[in-house]
Amino acid sequence: MDEEMQQTFMISAESAIDTVLEMEPKMSEGSSDELTLEFQKDGAGVKGDVRDIVIRREDIEWEIGLSIKHNHDAVKHSRLSHKLDFGKEWFDMPCSDAYWDAVQPIFDMLKNEKDNGSRWSEINDKDEVVYVPLLHAFMDEVNRAYKEDKNMPRKMIEYLIGIEDYYKVVSRDSKRLTMIHTFNMHDTLNKPSENKVSAITVPVVELPTRLVALEFKPGSDNTVEMYLDNGWQLSFRIHNASTKVEPSLKFDVQFVSMPMEVLNIECRWN
């Protein structure tokens, strides 16, 4: 990393420190124990913990986490393919035989095209023969899973945003701005210290309990939108990530809206 980038990171981090300290009085509470900052191992994200840094004090059994992003606010990048089981990965319910029966002919066709060295630009009507039927199979499977397990909406959001509470800190270099987003689903953030209550209240975020609607985005053949209760809305856009055909497609998952309780705090750079 060059010196200029290091300097940018320092300015970005410094702009957010005072706000994090204000929201977390226990970080600066007078105590004889050590305040420990620990970098998470890469494998933690696979297990549902998206925090990059964990800050803790052992003697009071307290910890908070930070997720650090640079110039992007991406949700998990997923795929649909002939072997990836999104149901098992997202909400711990393996995809049904009906799903695999629906998608197998599409992926078999794509595998043949790959073996022939075809390019995506050479696939006629790829929206109608690939994107639309795959998304229909995806929606049918999500609806099927929801009928079987009413906790599916909560499990899916936890897969996307993580199972632990944390602050997401996003550096926006071009805007000279650092954003802090609060994810306080389990009411572990923003606790008072022995002698201070934060001037900033970090609300508890309610996870979804109901799948309200799942349908194609109006005017689109490659994007579906999911509406959940408690203020959660997502979009799922399917697209090919390479020039040549593969039996695998990228699934771009984005939040269209989040609950009001997720605070979005702007920290301007000096």
Predicted regions and their residues:
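Short, positively charged
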Residues: M1-R51, R56-N270
